[in-house]
């Protein structure tokens, strides 16, 4: 059951055929059957002036004993907490009674100035809606899943005579077979690299494929079978593709046995060159499996979760098994109240984790979490198949879980060490530059271009827990009046766009209040930077400070410049800070290493963004400039005509003969390449 956000803040459920009749409940609380919009109802109590437990107590009087979801809001309208309940009256009533709450709950209750509610037909629906809202609203007092980047998959395309193999992330819009999820892009890259050697499947785009007149370098180094120029027959290539699918589907022994038989037969026929090819392909398959670590025979499709909770920090390690193969693992460090138990953290994490991800048939846990039966029912409803959640006690599966627990413990220890080191570095940064408090958010900027072309500005972000990659931003330089190679002009555009938008969305911060709250452990990650680092000298800093003054935020952000020394050697950097002469740091100063690391990360990110933009420009197709021609129609045209040049020469009747191209679209394409005829 997936929700779609509505303008009024509700969620529309649209994947059911059930009745849309309203559910009648007492009071003013709105019901939320599956097929109608979630109508949050706060009643009129927010105008009474009541706050905290008194306000909650008044709400309880009109709540039903129905399952549902509630939101607690502060005086500014920010969502403090989202929760679900089997009985709204009983669950919310717990906040109003005089019993002793934890510090976290007591603080949340004191700040509550309004509440909103929605009833659901079942507690399962309430659990799914709660997870959806927590991920979208990120309330301060909920357990929050960080680093929720989608997982990459391997895609073998199915809409071309010669299927290609790609890394894929996001919606499965393209026809083909998807294999995964993999824990990281690196794991996908290594697997594709080995699969190329084993099965010789192409990795080029369709537009490049259609324009080849001779095999590319990958064919020469035996990484592709050359279907573009018919170096391999269509039947032979289809067999290679099927073998790759079989291997990724868990039939690795069948594939390896077939290759071994072919190798032995070639050797018996004294065709040693062909035998060597099969030998190398077998070695490539073994290389794939050597990177997969443990592959338990009794686990076909499962995710394995283990939690290690110590020192107020939780680490949840996840291993992914599909088709009997280990596709990698990833560690998560959810934001949670240190007073919560590991079972409470794990339960909240699981519901959010699968909110936008495919659910496997089996989920294994290192320990029992809360409401496992309810969670299994909710995930089964979402996935459309039965999902079992178990805590293995013995045997191979218990050994597997223990292995994941060990990984969680090690990752937890590394995280604590890194966090402690980062805190010391931020304190040292504060002392070095004379700041009022240790910065909680540092933004580092750099530009990248080649002679002014495809210019990109990059922004990376660092904080108490290291680099915050979901806060990175890139800025494609758009100004036409900037002289090619004008770094000052590029930085001016980046700064203006960044802070103009920040002022519009967040307003100018109150630094006095922020300094007082800088050490609060439960404060959300700030949107405004305390410090910005610019990779440049006095000229860059003069331009940046002029922009900050123009925007009226000179006192809101500390700007620091980093200029390389005369010989441009690392360790000879000169720093430009406000209110003091430029200076250098001792070569072995830890703060200097810290700043160099941040600058190098900004440099890496800016160069990477520039390369992506340059690559897109290099493979840009004239069909991309035609409105209404998306990837599918572009692919259909290229498959029919071969090249964009052939499309430009095609007659209107020929364009209309292409599958998926209507008369209106054909005229649009024809007119684009024949402007005189259009006039």
Swiss-Prot record:
Residues 253-288 form the UVR domain. Keywords: Cytoplasm, DNA damage, DNA excision, DNA repair, Excision nuclease, SOS response. Residues 65-143 form the GIY-YIG domain. The UvrABC repair system catalyzes the recognition and processing of DNA lesions. UvrC both incises the 5' and 3' sides of the lesion. The N-terminal half is responsible for the 3' incision and the C-terminal half is responsible for the 5' incision. NCBIfam families: PRK00558.1-5, uvrC. Belongs to the UvrC family. This is UvrABC system protein C. The lineage of its organism: Bacteria, Pseudomonadati, Pseudomonadota, Alphaproteobacteria, Hyphomicrobiales. The gene is uvrC.
